[in-house]
Amino acid sequence: MKYKVTNFLLIIFLSINVISSEIPPYSAKYNFESEEISISGIREFYKTENGFEMRFKASNLFASLFFLSKFEIKNSEVISGSYEIKIRPKFLDRDQYLNFDYETMEVRSEGINKWVGSLKDDLVYDPLNVQIMIRTNVKHGLKNFKINIVDMEEGGSKSYEFNVVGLEECIFNGETLKCVILERSRLNSDRKVTYYLAEELEYMFIKIIDASPERTNTLTLLEVLSLG
């Protein structure tokens, strides 16, 4: 999904644009599990005076995770603003902050990974707000699409391809839901991310499995606290 710089700036700055989200606000409890940690927390998506925010906050006896994305939504497009990661204990050393600057057309990273990347004429998403764009595209009935996601370690962005690979019945809290199965991949990469999106829950993620030869991370929905 590419835009010329002029069109891109128009999307951001024209006041006549529609500022809304097709995905309703929600709060839900998820469990994140990897080889290093298993932890449950609350993921929230909500509107603020300056746009939208999405966050995930979790903690247990040994660690705490905090992820925060600030962005705008205009004409069904997510416009990244900032992205923040805070992880404790400190020895995990993963704190990072991204700022998307549309005057200089740069994204700047501070923290464990310091770099400055060019936004060029592409829309670039962070690891949290991209999920709003994914759900919006699936809700629109798109079967395949491409999205640019920021490269947290090296800077810049990488283009990923998303393909709907099937429909499946998912069991959540004893109820049977219709789930869209979506796969994310990238050329010359062994990493694959599989999303299970429940139609009855406004295409909320029931499960996300991020698998590569090195590790597998899983995010699983435990409870919907609020929707809409």
Where are these regions (language model features)?
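Sec-dependent signal peptide recognition
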Residues: 2-11
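Acidic, serine/threonine-rich low-complexity disordered tracts
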Residues: 21-102, 142-228
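Hydrophobic, well-structured mid-protein blocks that either form specific transmembrane helices
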Residues: 93-139
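Short, intrinsically disordered low-complexity segments
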Residues: 1-3, 134, 183
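Generic secondary-structure transition motif, activating predominantly at the C-termini of alpha-helices
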Residues: 13, 132, 136-138, 153, ...
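N-terminal signal peptide c-region/cleavage motif recognized by signal peptidases
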Residues: 15-17
